[in-house]
């Protein structure tokens, strides 16, 4: 059993809280202070490595990716910072990155991720067929490859993903790109209700969450929630996010 599956199996709260931040935004110093201050509230940290064409992201995260890249944030600086700051030593971190950032020296990169104490990878542009062949290599370095499912995933493909997924399932519960939504989409709720009957693997709701009432409504349906764009929007506006972050966290208890 993978480290993350074991973590979900032993969870003692209603939902795992999985905040998403883009590496280096608004600065490495801010992230280090904020994340370590709140490490006991963060069950898993999803950290995005800035990329020039983040196809799954809405306008907020696209802008944040751009600003981080302009400042020179990349995969190497992200890994160096994780080690230097102690963030990956104190918090379970999964990286979101695009495959062409690592494919040329794949095994060398996976070893470095392991040495950095990364727990898993989310790779939006990785075809399922390639993911299937890579899972043994990821397992060699004790890294979870986290797979996506969505309401548009075909039944045959869904069965294959549910069977081969080595970790929790990242449920894209709305159509389109990342971003805040005012309410939970009925399609997403019914989709996850159906999937829940077909697998015992943990399900995590991604995309569209922005407030505590949405999170509270997901208790009993999913095992964890990811909040990214709503946090990023407040950071873009130079807002103090602590009170908002605490509100989201309390909703997962």
Swiss-Prot record:
The active site is at residues 46, 57. Its EC number is 4.2.1.20. It catalyses: (1S,2R)-1-C-(indol-3-yl)glycerol 3-phosphate + L-serine = D-glyceraldehyde 3-phosphate + L-tryptophan + H2O. It comes from the Bacteria. One of its GO terms (molecular function) is tryptophan synthase activity. Coiled coil: none annotated. It holds the Pfam family Trp_syntA. Keywords: Amino-acid biosynthesis, Aromatic amino acid biosynthesis, Lyase, Tryptophan biosynthesis. GO terms for biological process: L-tryptophan biosynthetic process. Pathway: Amino-acid biosynthesis; L-tryptophan biosynthesis; L-tryptophan from chorismate: step 5/5. It is an enzyme of class 4 (lyase). InterPro entries: Aldolase_TIM, RibuloseP-bd_barrel, Trp_synthase_alpha_AS, Trp_synthase_suA. GO terms for cellular component: cytosol. The alpha subunit is responsible for the aldol cleavage of indoleglycerol phosphate to indole and glyceraldehyde 3-phosphate. Tetramer of two alpha and two beta chains. Belongs to the TrpA family. This is Tryptophan synthase alpha chain. It comes from Dictyoglomus turgidum (strain DSM 6724 / Z-1310).
